[in-house]
Every structure is written in C-alpha cells, then in structure tokens.
Curated annotation (Swiss-Prot):
Domain of life: Bacteria
Enzyme class: oxidoreductase
Full protein name: NADH-dependent flavin reductase
pH-activity note: Optimum pH is 7.5.
Binding, FAD: 39-46, 48-49, 63-65, 69-70, 95-96
Natural source organism: Rhodococcus sp
GO MF terms held by the record: FAD binding; flavin reductase (NADH) activity; FMN binding; NAD binding; riboflavin reductase (NADPH) activity
Stated induction or repression of this protein's expression: By 4-NP in the presence of NphR.
C-alpha cells in the first residue's frame, strides 16, 4: 500500500478515502441543536459533510457520525441549525471541533428555537424530516424552516487545512 499521491492503490481504506475526499474543497459549518432556548443546553459540532438536497421543498442534509453525541441530540430534539462560517471564524470552527477552547468567541442568535452562530454567513433553522443510517454515519435530512444570509468571504476547508477563496474570472453570480 502506498502513501504517494497520484498512484493507484487497489485497497480502499478509511485513511485513503479521507485523504482522497479531503481534496474536495468545502465550506465549514457548525451544526447546532438545543433542548430549549438556553445557551447552557446548546450542543454544537464542526461539520463539512453538509449539502443541499432540494429547493422545493427546501431540504438540506448533514452527515453525522453515529459515535458523535450530536447524532443522539438531533434525534432527541428533531431540529438542527446550520451556520456556514465566515472567513474570520476559524477559531469558532476549532472550538466546536474540540481542538481549541474559545468560549468568548461563541455567540448565538436564535431562529425558530434553534441556536445559530453570530457572525456566520448563513443561518439555516431546520426540522428533521428523515434520518437514514449510512455506514458509520446517519444522514439527517432537514426541512429549512427559516434562513438568513449575508455577503462576505466563507471559511473553506481543503486537504485538512483552512483556506480562503480567490476570485477567478467574473465577479457576478451565475444567474442567481
């Protein structure tokens, strides 16, 4: 088995799959949920396994490890929030990933009873409509009940590191 990039390895191991999929740049999200509108009941985690599913109805999906407390918390509350982080929120991401303790940087806003991170580019308050087991993860499909967004630069994750975006070409949205 080889660790060299660019060589074909016939064995698909979790490590090699993680390295391969790490080459797909993604935004960084914090998934949150709470039993009530009290900051002491908030549970959150950093996640990049998030995607849109449908525009009509408005559905998104987050993939959570079955070993994570968040999987149980989402099942218990039936709701979750997605905060898509801004470029200056790396410390917040690290806080929720357990890599750093930065409680002074964590401020919540509440939308539809769901905690979301102040300063994020996007807030999505979701109600779980389906949960599907998928290997060692659960795919939680959520209906977006309320959303908010702002302009700015996103925090990006690529090959295990935080990055920023560089504009290539035109500075206009593609039909949005």
């Amino acid at each position: 088995m080889t660790e060299t990039a660019g060589e074909l390895d016939p064995e698909v191991t979790p490590l090699h799959l993680r390295k391969a999929l790490g080459r797909f740049a993604s935004g960084v999200t914090i998934v949150t949920t709470a039993e009530c509108e009290d900051e002491d009941s908030v549970h959150g985690m950093t996640a990049n396994a998030f995607t849109s599913v449908s525009l009509d109805p408005p559905l998104v999906l987050v993939s959570i490890s079955t070993r994570a407390k968040m999987d149980t918390k989402i099942r218990e509350t039936g709701t979750y929030g997605i905060s898509i982080l801004a470029g200056d929120q790396e410390p917040v991401s690290l806080h929720f990933a357990g890599a750093a303790h930065e409680p002074d940087r964590v401020r919540f806003v509440w939308r539809r009873g769901v905690p979301l991170l102040e300063g994020a580019l996007v807030h999505l308050a979701c109600t779980v409509v389906a949960s599907h087991p998928a290997g060692d993860h659960t795919l939680h499909v959520g209906r977006v009940e309320q959303l908010w967004y702002d302009d700015g630069h996103p925090l990006v994750f690529y090959t295990g590191s935080f990055r920023s975006l560089e504009l290539l070409g035109r500075d206009e949205p593609w039909g949005f």
